[in-house]
Amino acid sequence: MLGKGGVGGGGGTKAPKPSFVSYVRPEEIHTDEKEVTEKEVTLHLLPGEQLLCEASTVLKYVQEDSCQRGVYGRLVCTDFKISFLGDEDSALDNGGEAQFKNKIIGVNDVPLHCVDQIYGVFDEKKKPLFGQLKKYPEKLVIHCKDLRVLHFCLRYTKEEEVKRIVSGIIHHTQSPKLLKRLFLFSYAAAVHGTATDSRNCTVMFDTPKDWCWELERTKGSVKYRTVSVNEGYRVSDRLPAYFVVPTPLPEDDVRRFQGHGIPIWCWSCHNGSALLKMSALPKEQDDGALQVQKSFLDGIYKTIHRPPYEMVKTEDLSSNFLSLQEIQSAYCKFKQLFLIDNSSEFWDTDIKWFSLLESSSWLDIIRRCLKKAIEITECLEAQNVNVLLLEENASDLCCLLSSLVQVMMDAHCRTRTGFQSLIQKEWVMGGHSFLDRCNHLHQSDKEEVPIFLLFLDCVWQLVHQYPPAFEFTETYLTVLSDSLYIPIFSTFFFNSPHQKDTNMGRENLDAQSKPLTLLTVWDWSVQFEPKAQTLLRNPLYVEKPKLDRGQQKGSRFKHQRQLSLPLTQSKSSPKRGFFREETDHLIKNLLGKRISKLINSSDDLQDSSREFYDSWHSKPTDYHGLLLPHIEGPEIKVWAQRYLRWIPEAQILGGGRVATMGKLLEMMEEVQSLQEKIEARHHRQEAVHAEAPGLLRNSVRLSSLFPFALLQRHSAKPVLPTSGWKALGGEDDLAKREDEFVDLGDV
């Protein structure tokens, strides 16, 4: 019914006009014809899910410039998701998408928690929608937190249905909610149990045994011990029931300020140094109270500074690092680059892509996080000193940096099970406020800060730079970021373990009823079939070979890289403010920003960290040892699979990293086949090999953003938009121009 003209290019001539122009607007299409194209599709409801409102004869637009093509169907809203029920086969022409199918969220489903902003189109003008509406839009545009943009035309829908569906979507995605009203509890009550995967070995850190196991694994049990003083959350609602502190620390000290001002263990290095975190004491104005706090902190200092403990270096993240407002502001600007309404908008912004990207500061924030993690790693690895991370509640940037350092230093955290256990330990049990930071209850936009997404982006930089070092793939990180907004898993929907345990329904249930059992996101079989799960595991990853006892004695606590570092780096320098020279700095840092602002330690380790960084990168990479990311400007890249996957124009058919991976997998399968033949000749038992994902075998037909990108169309726009040609001058002039020099400054 609608025609599309080709776009000419080249020469200095104007592009030819389309050979066919349609004079029939969508409004003139007969209703009977529309009803024929609309197919009845069954709405799949999860246990406990209820239909709230719906509208029929809704047109879902294909995101393409100047073409109002799409598919008709029903738009429904449940207490779990917004769903479009149409003819998916005509709307999607993508075999890879169907093979990597999420069993919980369909292609045309959006969880209510994933909705970021809702816009209405009135007379071709887009306006944000809030609260009660006096006039209802003819088009509905939904921006999602996973950066999808959905367009729905309501011109052919009955007026009563338009009011019902628009009001329902606005109310259920933007109105403040109570925690117990989340779909999480409805689902848990309906399923009456959990479908756990027996192969899931993720350590949950909800028992003393889990913490003791981690201490033994990292050889930290000599200097640190697990305490149960907060069992039943008698001391603090913020802390987990069990955690680890220095062995000589009295339990009375933990109780004194509800866990504030206590050094809590995160991880131990092979050389005996450890990573610790501490929350600040309550701010006091009274001199007497300040003196009490000073005496308390002085006692803590003496406890952690005497032998066998190493010297301590503090990192005050509240005053000398990123602020939450910086992160929030940067991501708000950054995400706008990918919330594209149509291909015309994409091409218009393409010419100023780099300036927009730079002005958002998101990549610079990632670089600063990686740089700070390198500095902490240098203290632990090269200088053999403990590092104490200080933050107001020790639940935001402490979680990010402590996790990032462990990913860089501990190969176990680069396995899938180890990475999931790390998130459980540092984020879930560490008291990160997922409920507030993701704004699941829509109670405070100011509290919504993507700290966890920033962490995943930092990890992706490492995965991108060192693929063989990680058992999981970037696809794993992408679906993990999507799982933040799926309210059937409890992992990312509470502010603390205490909040989760007290809202399991125990106090409100009858004596005959059982408490609710909530699912964990780590059981990936809930979301994906086994074939799809193969894309979550890196087929090029090889586990660290186990050494025999004789070899273990010779290299027990050594990294390969440590021996190549200058021996002088392990000695402390009086210029760096370690506590042996500046015994009052811990106390000053913890007594509030009023004092800590006077202490300038933002770049104390710059010189030594640079030497450590350059020395490491001059050696061959040990994928099972220490990893340091490249942090030079061009090395920090955009996580294309997550941020660009819904933009067709950003795809490369048969190109990108997926094409390279496909060829590597073909070679890997051939090597495995030859190995099996050799073993068969020697009458050995066949070895178990990792199966290369069949979805990647035809890499020529796949998109560079596989397995998420849609391949139903390709833009006919030129690589450089016409607006860019006009700005740059003629073609001859463009060919003679030199690249513009941009000073990136010091890394």
UniProtKB/Swiss-Prot annotation:
Residues 449-558 are annotated as: Interaction with MTM1. The gene is Mtmr12. The keyword Transcription regulation does not apply. Expressed in skeletal muscles (at protein level). It comes from Mus musculus. InterPro entries: MTMR12-like_C, MTMR12_PTP, Myotubularin, Myotubularin-like_Pase_dom, PH-like_dom_sf, Prot-tyrosine_phosphatase-like. This is Myotubularin-related protein 12. Keywords: Cytoplasm, Phosphoprotein, Sarcoplasmic reticulum. It holds the Pfam family Myotub-related. PROSITE patterns: PPASE_MYOTUBULARIN (PS51339). Residues 562-572 have a biased composition (Polar residues).
